[in-house]
Amino acid sequence: VPGSFNHSAALEAAFAIRRLIVLTYIRAALKYSYKTCPVSTGCTSSKGYGVKYHAEGYTYARAVLGFVAALNRTAAQIVEDQLSPSRAPNEFSLEAHCRVRAALQSVYPILGIDCDMVGEGYMIQHDVCGSSCSSPPAPPIPAGVQDGYDPFATAGMFCGPGEESI
């Protein structure tokens, strides 16, 4: 229906989607920065350094570091430095993981997320870094579409020439 576009609802949905994407990659970056950490340095779930975990941690972090850097360059640089592919296996430790964790936690408020949303992960002890996560509560992420919403009521599945724009 022409003229039925709700700009504020679209912005709210875009913000919610962005927050969900950020949550996914921050959780994965934290998980693999921890799994990269060898048992000998205080980590309990990892058997030792693994190039696979290193690559996964770096890749997941890189997925959101551009966005994080736009908001807090220092935090992004800390994560980049700690998970960089140029780091030697013997440079990974619980301390490196805790630096990643602290840097990411410091930007939760400006990312619109909080500690409860990120969680602790299935293998990361709550106080593994000597302190628990604390951040102000973020607004809840909307649960989904409103009752009665029909995505096909206003848009066809396929567009004809000139029908691509909203």
PLM ranges: what are they?
Residues 1-166:
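Mature extracytoplasmic or organellar-lumen-exposed domains after removal of signal/transit peptides
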